[in-house]
Curated annotation (Swiss-Prot):
A divalent metal cation 3 binds at C15, C19, C24, C29. One of its GO terms (molecular function) is zinc ion binding. A divalent metal cation 6 binds at C37, C41, C44, C60. One of its GO terms (biological process) is cellular response to interleukin-3. A divalent metal cation 7 binds at C50, C57, C59, C60. Keywords: Acetylation, Cadmium, Metal-binding, Metal-thiolate cluster, Phosphoprotein, Zinc. This metallothionein binds zinc. The gene is MT2A. This is Metallothionein-2. A divalent metal cation 1 binds at C5, C7, C21, C24.
Length: 61
């Protein structure tokens, strides 16, 4: 279990706004999280958990 993620391996969970999961094994939480990400972002499609759309997103620049 990831000390920075409140879930057991394989279970579903959600990333907090700060997303400190580094080695998360959850099925619904990825290692990389974008706090803002437009729909269709290539990086988000590769595993980012998007928390909201924004035109000021830096993770897809």
């Amino acid at each position: 279990m990831d000390p920075n993620c409140s879930c057991a391996a394989g279970d579903s969970c959600t990333c907090a706004g700060s997303c400190k999961c580094k080695e998360c094994k959850c099925t619904s939480c990825k290692k990389s999280c974008c706090s803002c990400c437009p729909v269709g972002c290539a990086k988000c499609a590769q595993g980012c958990i998007c928390k909201g759309a924004s035109d000021k997103c830096s993770c897809c620049a």
